[in-house]
């Protein structure tokens, strides 16, 4: 599945399970790429606004070993007023096949469980101006080490931070 576009949509059914769902498994394999969604307004959904699942139907009897790849998933200007999860990514346990997922200018309110739920392997998931329940979601920690946080918080706390001497 490649080059899918959904834009300028309004979804407002109480029966809506997910807004954008990508499902595959190691029986099917293949590449799912260039999935684009923008300018979408959602009233509510039952599970996740975005769900990527590369382990769909794990008990399915089949010949396994065809690891699927999900890449280049892009959501911009998507709002949702109520859901259980914000973003849910279920990657393969042994291969990193989910990557380059971007959420930009998205706002999910009324998320009552986890805003970002990830299991298995995935990488390069980016959030740019993405808020859940009014809080900004970050792709990574704002500080590399706790000492950076400590220095910054002390500099904000003290009226004249240039007088601080951390060498002692």
Annotate the PLM regions.
Residues 1-168:
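Extracellular/periplasmic carbohydrate-active domains that bind, remodel
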């Amino acid at each position: 599945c490649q080059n899918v576009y959904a834009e300028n949509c309004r979804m407002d059914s109480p029966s809506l399970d997910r807004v954008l769902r990508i499902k595959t498994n190691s029986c099917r394999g293949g590449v799912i790429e260039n999935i684009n969604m923008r300018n979408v307004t959602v009233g509510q959904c039952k599970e996740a606004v975005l769900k990527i699942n590369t382990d769909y139907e794990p008990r399915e009897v089949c010949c396994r070993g065809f690891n699927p790849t999900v890449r280049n998933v892009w959501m911009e200007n998507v709002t949702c007023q109520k859901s259980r999860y914000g973003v849910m990514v279920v990657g393969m346990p042994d291969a990193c096949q989910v990557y380059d997922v971007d959420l930009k200018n998205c706002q999910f309110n009324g998320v009552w469980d986890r805003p970002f739920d990830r299991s298995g392997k995935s990488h390069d998931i980016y959030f740019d101006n993405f808020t859940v329940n009014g809080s900004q979601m970050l792709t990574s920690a704002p500080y590399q080490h706790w000492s950076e946080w400590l220095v910054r918080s002390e500099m904000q706390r003290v009226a004249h931070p240039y007088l601080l001497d951390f060498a002692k």
